[in-house]
Amino acid sequence: MVLDPVLGKESDVTPSSLVIDGDSFAHRAYHGVPKSVRRLGDKGGGAIVGFANFLLRLYAQEKPRAVLVGWDTLDAPTYRHCALATYQGGRAFDAELMDQLDVLPQFVAACGLACAKAPGYEADDFLAAAVAQEERLGGTAVVASGDRDAFQLSSDRTTILQPVRAGEMARIGPTEVRERYGVDPKHVPDFIALRGDPSDKIPGLAGVGPKGAASLLRRYGSLEAALAQGSFAAQAEQLRLYRAIATMDASAPLPPLDDQTPTWGAAAALAREWELNQLANRLAAIDGRSQI
């Protein structure tokens, strides 16, 4: 039996690791919580509160053995930016969002949960590394991400949680990936290379949309097989680059992901220090239930 520290109930379910794209959900929180939510020094607090509420809700739902939150390093380019000048071009973040992204890892750490952030890597890469480690050790993982690139991580041991509407998450396994994209999870980078990704400014192959990309992959089996047969010879170098950019880097460095006991009380103290008192009260109440 496993004690759920949030709900104070026991569960027979074998816990998975929970891996979260921190930037993805911090952005959603920033745009979903009123800007009137302030913290100490009249700084923005909405993204912190919204992300914290999301984290608590997801923790109660999944009852994980461990949590890892991956973060982008926005002040340092990754190899993707160096390889493709247009990658993620035109993105701009409000100063208040940047400020909260800077301190959210501190909040997650106060909760007793793991964070991963390093120059040259994106949050996606830490998700891939954590999933690879968990599967290698025979465990299971749940990956929460608003980025469909994460579908490439789906397997019989890893489920993707994708936000679909307010407060709701779709559970994506290999069957759902095939239904949505018409390809297996391992071919999602090939699919993105052919179709392109407007949000990341990956151009793709001119004139090829989602159906065309899926059709080409069904015909050839993979992008590499298509290139080996001489297809798209003039674009081969670029397509391989697009595939590499769309592929999550499972070699990203990770902190230890041993079983965790959340420290909601410490997180409550930090929230109170930041004068986010409603959040502090909620965390303190959860901490009180987990001690029973």
Functional labels for PLM-detected ranges:
Residues 5, 11-144, 148, 152-159, ...:
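Noncatalytic, basic helical substrate-engagement surface that gates or grips nucleic-acid strands
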Residues 4, 14-15, 65-68, 136, ...:
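Non-catalytic nucleic-acid-binding/docking modules located in mid-to-C-terminal regions
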